[in-house]
Curated annotation (Swiss-Prot):
Organism: Clostridium novyi (strain NT)
Catalysed transformations (reactions): cytidine(34) in elongator tRNA(Met) + acetate + ATP = N(4)-acetylcytidine(34) in elongator tRNA(Met) + AMP + diphosphate
Keyword list, A-Z: ATP-binding, Cytoplasm, Ligase, Nucleotide-binding, RNA-binding, tRNA processing, tRNA-binding
Entry protein name: tRNA(Met) cytidine acetate ligase
Localisation: Cytoplasm
Gene3D superfamilies documented for this protein: HUPs (3.40.50.620)
Keyword Nucleotide-binding: yes
Keyword tRNA processing: yes
Length: 400
């Protein structure tokens, strides 16, 4: 079988995602699609608007054949570790021929050439990177500027490095090189809104714009013509039953934890240079998640980095060796759902995978899996439709 992997969050699944699925099938001529999907928390450092089982079902109804959960140790990390965890998982299951991702560029050769520089790190690039870091800018900004210098201020490189999905695509390709993978990368140019756009568009609205509208509106009927019907129906039902969650859902718990439990925020690997003191200080004076992050962010610490730190703290990741875990290849593949084609893929995967494939949780839990379970515990505190023990009780979805 010719199998293509895609890496997703579906927060929530929209028409742009369906376009990606259909174009992936067309571009790679694949017999099936395996989707690596973030669980209940996503890379921006926020809880998913709908739980992972609901989003898995939507994916299966939209043309995906098999959904595997991306462990939270990767899904709540920077683009580099998010990509590495995802690619290592696709590589380890042993049956993936291609990956296909969306990008603003749409040019796989440009993306691969930048990935090669980041993987090899020639001395000229490293010197530029050090110079910018010494000026106090954040690592992502310093890296982008160093790349532009390396490519002699190439305007095309500057444009590529401005966009979130291009950066993720570069990290995917870099991880393929790092792992010496035989998986072939493809990219599809994104249509409609950019990843960070917060305004609705009639055809391809971004997930950011959709979440923003749902969060700030009393009526979401306008989304009926923008979203796939199944996504809208799920959202509408959960909206009316107050079962949707946003970053502010975590705020009171984070504030209480910081004031009473005194867990060590500084144990998280992205908390450096006394940042924990700034966070503790601003927590006392902030009244919302957005206000808190806005008060902390700086030239050195981007909004999403602060958001991820707070989300990790909410879950309790400071009690694990996150710095070690996120640099290692994914140690297992946990199946969330599949259809008939996915069933055939699973059969092949179990023969060829170099890591265990879990349909249900094993008796012995490694730290990466413990963190996934702890993430569900935390998510159940802010989403009343999710049971704290759902990881133990929920079987993979089988869409016939």
């Amino acid at each position: 079988m010719n199998i293509t992997g895609i890496i997703t969050e579906y927060n929530p699944l929209h028409k742009g995602h369906i376009y990606h699925i259909n174009k992936t099938k067309e571009l790679t001529s694949c017999d099936g699609i395996v989707c690596i999907m973030s669980g209940n928390f996503v890379q921006r450092g926020i809880p998913a608007i709908m739980d992972k089982w609901t989003r898995c079902e939507l994916a299966l109804n939209s043309g995906v054949d098999l959904v595997i959960e991306l462990p939270s140790v990767y899904s709540l990390s920077s683009a580099e570790f998010f990509a590495y965890g995802s690619i290592s998982l696709l590589n380890s299951i042993g049956i993936i021929n291609n990956i296909c991702f969306g990008s603003e560029s749409g040019n796989i050769d440009d993306i691969k050439s930048i990935a090669k520089i980041l993987n090899n790190e020639p001395s000229e690039f490293k010197n530029h990177l050090k110079d910018y870091l010494d000026k106090g800018v954040s690592y992502p900004v310093a890296r982008s500027k160093a790349l532009v210098e390396y490519f002699n201020d190439n305007l095309e490189t500057q444009e590529i490095l401005k966009s979130s999905n291009n950066i993720l695509g570069i990290e995917y390709c870099k991880s393929l090189l790092k792992l010496k993978s035989t998986i072939i990368p493809y990219t599809i140019q994104r249509k409609g809104s950019n990843y960070n756009d917060d305004k609705l568009e009639s055809k391809f609205s971004s997930a950011t714009a959709i979440r923003s509208h749902v969060k700030n509106s009393k009526n979401i009927n306008i989304l009926k013509d923008i979203l796939p019907s199944k996504t809208f129906n799920y959202l509408y039902d959960k909206f009316n039953n107050n079962n949707l969650v946003f970053e502010d859902s975590m705020f009171s718990f984070i504030k209480y934890k910081s004031l009473t439990l005194k867990n060590k925020l500084e144990n998280l690997p992205d908390v450096k240079e006394g940042l924990h003191n700034k966070i503790y200080s601003e927590l006392k004076n902030s009244n919302s998640f957005y206000e808190l992050v806005s008060n902390i962010k700086s030239k050195r610490y981007a909004y999403t980095r602060i958001s991820r730190i707070l989300c990790q703290y909410f879950i309790g990741m400071e009690n694990f060796n996150l710095e070690y875990l996120r640099t290692k290849k994914s140690p297992y593949g946990r199946v969330l759902g599949f259809n008939d084609t996915g069933r055939k893929i699973l059969k092949e995967m179990k023969k060829k995978s170099s890591i265990p494939i879990y349909m249900k949780l094993p008796k012995t839990l490694n730290d990466t899996l413990k963190l996934d379970i702890q993430s569900t515990y935390a998510y159940s505190m802010i989403n009343k439709s999710v049971s704290y023990d759902s990881d133990f009780k929920t079987s993979p979805i089988y869409l016939k």
